[in-house]
């Protein structure tokens, strides 16, 4: 007997501070004005997507001592945008990336509980940590933590926030107009938490929200990040969008759940994925090449090499050969605030590999960056992309995808109009929303209904 088809989850990532965005395209809109966010969210909701996802950047990146201005620079506050979007959408989940290294549990819990009320139960929290002192300077001098301590703090941060969410049970508000009694229990919201990172006590001032707690996402790919996701998260935002790497990641993380008393269906794996859509596969391949050349200008290619070489390469011609000099293997002093710096842990080996590739293919600096960088995950006609997405989900390489269009706010429209109907015809994607909350859309139980989720505050 064949197993039933898995239902696909789809989300929309409003792109910003990353090299997937072609902000200079004439069709691109603002990354700050609310109209762009609203249009993007309405398209996602029209297509019956599960949620909208906002990333976060806590400091403007620098390169060579100057603001890195080849990508989008600056963005509005995440909570402000999500609260505004709650007013112009009805079903779409609202996921915000909020840092656990530089915030406090009470403040963040208050913001998410408020967003959950305002949206009718559609809030989600992507819990992240920060690894660099450069970003920390915006918050406190010398402000960063070693990796182990970052995840220790993140775990306690989330546990503390959950205590605050659970300090209200949901039945405390009586609001009896005849007797003038508003609260059934004067101890509502009382909490006491004493731990390694937080020592707080008081009363939480936001009543229990529709979801009880926001849906929790985690985006780390390290060993610590995978364990954190397996023990705490409802969904994990990953970068593994191919069959082989996706299945390996999916199996690894799902197999960690048992040690925490959790089932496989209690954690969703949702890789980020870019796409290029055209009428035919051949046209899509050509369009993908155009998009990559838009994303990698000559100046961008030189800056990309500087991440690895850790040197000022501004005098080099992007249409010329790679530098003969070796990378500076000391502390990176060229690029600051860029996670990509950590992707090349052995710059000498990376430079050697790139020189060999460039020599074998007669590539210039720009051609090398175009060919070795991130190409679109899904390239093809609507039918090809729908088939590919479905095959990956049914093969347990993912539970769905967080789609990242290269143009905002209109870059999602064609996917919504052409790919989504094909997935619906295959019976693997909803035609209507399942219920009022994001937990309903994702098939996740309410915290009150999950065994072992006892409340620890009273």
What are these regions (language model features)?
Residues 2-16, 148-211, 244-248, 255-393, ...:
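An alpha-helical appendage that flanks or caps ligand/catalytic pockets
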Residues 3, 9-19, 23-35, 77, ...:
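Hydrophobic, small-residue-rich alpha-helical packing segments that form membrane-like cores
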Residues 8-12, 52-54, 92-96, 123-127, ...:
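Hydrophobic faces of well-ordered beta-strands that scaffold small-molecule active sites
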Residues 49, 120, 233, 397-398:
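A structural motif
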């Amino acid at each position: 007997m064949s197993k039933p088809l898995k239902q696909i989850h789809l989300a929309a990532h409003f792109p910003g501070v990353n090299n997937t965005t072609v902000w200079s395209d004439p069709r691109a809109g603002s990354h700050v004005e609310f109209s762009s966010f609203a249009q993007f969210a309405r398209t996602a909701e029209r297509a019956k997507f599960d949620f909208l996802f906002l990333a976060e950047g806590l400091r403007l990146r620098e390169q060579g001592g100057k603001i890195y201005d080849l990508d989008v620079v600056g963005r509005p506050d995440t909570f402000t945008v999500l609260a505004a979007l709650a007013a112009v959408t009805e079903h779409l989940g609202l996921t915000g990336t909020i840092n656990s290294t530089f915030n406090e549990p009470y403040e963040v819990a208050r913001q998410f509980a408020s967003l959950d009320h305002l949206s009718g139960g559609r809030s989600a929290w992507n819990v992240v940590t920060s690894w660099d002192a450069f970003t920390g300077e915006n918050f406190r001098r010398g402000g960063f933590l070693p990796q182990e301590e970052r995840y220790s703090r993140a775990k306690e941060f989330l546990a503390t926030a959950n205590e605050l969410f659970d300090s209200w049970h949901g039945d405390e508000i009586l609001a009896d107009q005849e007797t003038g009694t508003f609260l059934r229990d004067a101890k509502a919201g009382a909490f006491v938490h004493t731990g390694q990172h937080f020592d707080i006590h008081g009363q939480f001032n936001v009543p229990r929200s529709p979801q009880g707690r926001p849906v929790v996402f985690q985006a780390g790919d390290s060993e610590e990040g995978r364990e954190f996701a397996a023990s705490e998260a409802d969904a994990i935002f990953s970068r593994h969008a191919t069959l082989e790497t996706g299945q390996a990641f999916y199996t690894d993380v799902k197999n960690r759940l048992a040690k925490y008393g959790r089932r496989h269906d209690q954690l969703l794996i949702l890789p980020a994925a870019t796409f290029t859509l055209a009428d035919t596969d051949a046209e899509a391949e050509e369009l993908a090449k155009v998009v990559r050349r838009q994303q990698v200008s000559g100046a961008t290619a030189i800056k990309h090499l500087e991440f690895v070489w850790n040197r000022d390469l501004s005098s080099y011609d992007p249409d010329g050969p790679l530098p003969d000099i070796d990378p500076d293997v000391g502390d990176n002093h060229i690029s600051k605030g860029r996670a990509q710096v950590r992707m090349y842990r052995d710059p000498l080996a990376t430079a050697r590999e790139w020189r060999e590739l460039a020599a074998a293919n007669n590539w210039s600096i720009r051609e090398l960056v175009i060919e070795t960088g991130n190409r679109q995950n899904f390239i093809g006609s609507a039918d090809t992309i729908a088939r590919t997405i479905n095959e990956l989900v049914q093969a347990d390489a993912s539970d769905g995808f967080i789609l990242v269009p290269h143009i905002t706010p209109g870059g999602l429209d064609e996917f919504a109009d052409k790919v989504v109907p094909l997935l619906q015809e295959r019976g693997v994607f909803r035609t209507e929303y399942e219920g009022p909350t994001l937990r309903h859309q994702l098939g996740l139980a309410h915290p009150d209904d999950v065994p072992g989720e006892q409340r620890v505050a009273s």
